Amino acid sequence: MDQDALISKEDSEVEREASGGRESLSDVIGFLDAVLSSEPTDIGGDRSWLHNTINTLQRPGSTHRAKGEGEGEVSTSSTQDNRSGEESRVSGGTSEPEAEAHARNVDKQNIHWATGRGASTDSVPQDLGNGRDSGILEDPPNEGGYPRSGAEDENREMAANPDKRGEDQAEGLPEEIRRSAPLPDEGEGRADNNGRGVESGSPHSARVTGVLVIPSPELEEAVLQRNKRRPANSGSRSLTPVVVPSTRSPPPDHDNSTRSPPRKPPTTQDEHTNPRNTPAVRIKDRRPPTGTRSAPDRPTDGYPTHPGPETDATKKGIGENTSSMKEMATLLTSLGVIQSAQEFESSRDASYVFARRALKSANYAEMTFNVCGLILSAEKSFANRVDENKQLLKQIQESVESFRDIYKRFSEYQKEQNSLLMSNLSTLHIITDRGGKTDNPDSPTRSPSVFAKTKENKTKATRFDPSMETMGDMKYKPDLLREDEFRDEIRNPVYQERDTEPRASNASRLLPSREKPTIHSLRLVIESSPLSRAEKAAYVKSLSKCKTDQEVKAVMELVEEDIESLTN
């Protein structure tokens, strides 16, 4: 007894020391894995069939106490109750005394509790996914690691190993687990309750290794029958803590007393018959515990609603691969990314390859690897596209610069053509006005090539005008003087030759002009030249004083020399 107490004390100290660091993160991750993978059904449903089947085994002489009154009672949880009910239902009743079978179950739990101390956290999803824990705070110190094997497996194991109990006792397990009073629930005992609080995660699941075996066909059939027998009443789900029925539950007519509201302690049949004895039913803490799991995590039915997250995930992955591939191909086709589903399945592009591998991945590590590859391949393709766009923009910029050079050269060429055309026009005017006669130095007047019937100009006596003295030879030409004022605004002298200045008055147009058309065209050539304003006026004045073609030619040669000296 001293050795057992010493072992339990050392275990509690080790559990207190290791509850903070070693098991907090990994056990919480495994616990969340099991919560996400499990699919609890009918939690909090009507479980009256539990009491109906278990009541058939109630004998007047059997109680919870294995020893006398003074040695206390053994606190049982709903997991042991359900297992006892399962034994009575599957095997049809046992021949051994019930107290002895209960003690042997506790011995098996102690073996798993002692041998699984150094186990890894790999068994977390298996234990949690089974869903046998009922949410009771006062579990025995084996940390809730009850063996999850079926009732038939237990009976078969007991029949094969009759000396099992002797071996259990030889292991030197704590006697107080099987015989003495339950552990306290308040104060330091609750904090040291072998990892039942939030601060130590869920370490009781890491203590059991090799307990959850692959379910046999017989056990699966028993579970299916039990689920069929259970009424589908999932609507009456209770969020408040409920009373866990004991193995010695009252008959159906006492159901209402057992299922009393959680705020009031229930009155069981044991309390009616033997009020002095300590009750076999332990009441759950009235305060909603912060360190225990919620109802979906630990279904109170105590039945494995999920065969195991790992095997079920592989089955789901095999079935969902083809459907997810088809859905992805259909989505890409509808969005216009690909032409058909066959293109998605047979494409050799890196993005499509990683996408197919991510859809076919069996676990999270492989999926993460493939998704990272998909992201990197997409980034690489984007970088290549950006480089292509940069090259294209560079080519466009170069072509635009070449077009600018071409346009500049074309504009210069156009200016040259315009100047050449202007000189040709002026030369053409001179030739037509002379009538094609170059060798006629004797004739004082140049006659045009086209003769029209006109009246002879009769000289008329004009009245004296004071302005005639200032004009000199340029009297009767007020329109030319008026044109010189606006010469800078004339842009096209060829059009100006045909079209009189619009600012001239009608009276000035009616005055006769002595200037010949050839002299007028030469004057326009001088006006359009890049000479200064004073030089232009001097050349125009000298040109108007010319009497013969030789004088006109000499003046125009001087004009051309000045223009060439300026341009060169």
Swiss-Prot record:
Keywords: Chaperone, Coiled coil, Host cytoplasm, Phosphoprotein, Viral RNA replication. Residues 412-445 are annotated as: L protein binding. GO terms for cellular component: host cell cytoplasm. Residues 1-24, 38-319, 433-462 are annotated as: Disordered. GO terms for biological process: DNA-templated transcription; viral genome replication. InterPro entries: Paramyxo_PProtein_C, PProtein_oligomer_dom1, RNA_pol_Pprot-P_XD_paramyxovir. It is found in: Host cytoplasm. Pfam families: Paramyxo_P. Residues 33-41 are annotated as: N0 binding. SUPFAM superfamilies: Multimerization domain of the phosphoprotein from sendai virus, Phosphoprotein XD domain. Phosphorylated by PKC/PRKCZ, and other unknown kinases. Phosphorylation is necessary for viral transcription and replication. The N-terminus contains the majority of phosphorylated sites. Ser-249 is the major site of phosphorylation, but is not necessary for most functions. Residues 50-61 have a biased composition (Polar residues). GO terms for molecular function: RNA binding; RNA-directed RNA polymerase activity. Homotetramer. Interacts (via multimerization domain) with polymerase L; this interaction forms the polymerase complex. Interacts (via N-terminus) with N0; this interaction allows P to chaperon N0 before encapsidation and form the N-P complex. Interacts (via C-terminus) with N-RNA template; this interaction positions the polymerase on the template. The P/V/C gene has two overlapping open reading frames. One encodes the P/V/W proteins and the other the C/Y proteins. Essential cofactor of the RNA polymerase L that plays a central role in the transcription and replication by forming the polymerase complex with RNA polymerase L and recruiting L to the genomic N-RNA template for RNA synthesis. Also plays a central role in the encapsidation of nascent RNA chains by forming the encapsidation complex with the nucleocapsid protein N (N-P complex). Acts as a chaperone for newly synthesized free N protein, so-called N0, allowing encapsidation of nascent RNA chains during replication. This is Phosphoprotein. It comes from Sendai virus (strain Hamamatsu) (SeV). The gene is P/V/C.
